[in-house]
Amino acid sequence: MRVSEWERVLYRAIVAAGLKPIPQFSIEQYDLDFALVEGNRKLAIEVDGERYHRSWTGELCLRDQLRNQRLIELGWDVQRFWVYEVRDELQRCVRLVQDWIDNKRTDAV
């Protein structure tokens, strides 16, 4: 599995924030860009690249929707970021991941 530069950028930023993402996590037939596991809660983090998603067809859109739906059925939350979000708003992306952790901790209390 090829890792994009923007996946590396987001990974480093999430790690720098004190979180422990698992890169290239496999679940069923899917390879997640990252996974965060917090107790019994699981977050799939995906970086949607410009090249891959530049010319969305109905097939690509449907495939990602089915993937998200299956992950949710398996008990995962899904957070997707576009490359431009990682590039232009990196700290906001990290904050969204941290908010997920904080919200899930609150839910568990």
Question: What name fits each language-model region?
Answer:
Residues 1-109:
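Nucleic-acid endo/exonuclease domains
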